[in-house]
Amino acid sequence: MNREEALACVKQQLTEHRYIHTVGVMNTAIELAERFGADSKKAEIAAIFHDYAKFRPKEEMKQIIAREKMPAHLLDHNPELWHAPVGAYLVQREAGVQDEDILDAIRYHTSGRPGMTLLEKVIYVADYIEPNRAFPGVDEVRKLAETDLNQALIQSIKNTMVFLMKKNQPVFPDTFLTYNWLVSGS
């Protein structure tokens, strides 16, 4: 699937605002992939499809999580996390993407995971720093991403955890595990 086909496919699933975000993530992911030695074509496709399920009804996502035996603890956390694993599932079935590297980059772009691949890190950080994002801490992560993808990832996860904690919201366990894995030098 080429860029134009992928963008046309995903555009049907997104609002105009989210589509603009997706194009920003795509361009940022390609840039990061080239900078840090990841496969830029895989980064392009993963970035295009990363929010494919973002606007699916919560009930549909819940059913997919249960039916496909995705980790049950997903349902105990913010539904904003669900679109990543559900998106990987739907992109495979509806868009025909079969590459596991791409599907994993989509699957873990909201939570991270210990043992993240370079491509997964690229998509996570690209989603966080794409040019249309404007929130406290994003410029610091952009600066880190110029030279050190791991430090950019660590800082983005720290920022996310602090944001959630300040709002007395739970942090998804996989995100804590990812942070610990990263700072332990793994």
UniProtKB/Swiss-Prot annotation:
| Task performed by this protein | Hydrolyzes diadenosine 5',5'''-P1,P4-tetraphosphate (Ap4A) to yield ADP.
Q: Which GO terms describe its molecular function?
A: hydrolase activity; metal ion binding; nucleotide binding
Q: What is its EC number?
A: 3.6.1.41
Q: Which InterPro entries match?
A: Diverse_Catalytic_Enzymes, HD/PDEase_dom, HD_domain, YqeK
Record key words, sorted: Hydrolase, Iron, Metal-binding, Nucleotide-binding
What's the catalysed reaction? Answer: P(1),P(4)-bis(5'-adenosyl) tetraphosphate + H2O = 2 ADP + 2 H(+)
Say which enzyme class the record assigns.
hydrolase
Protein name per the record: Bis(5'-nucleosyl)-tetraphosphatase, symmetrical
What family is this? Belongs to the Ap4A hydrolase YqeK family.
List the effects observed when the gene is inactivated. Answer: Mutant shows increased levels of Ap4G, Ap4U, Ap3A and Ap4A. Cells form pellicles that are initially flat and thin. The pellicles finally become thicker, their flat surfaces are broken by a number of broad pits, the inner surface of which are covered with fruiting bodies. The colonies also show a defect in gross morphology, in that their central region is flat ang glossy.
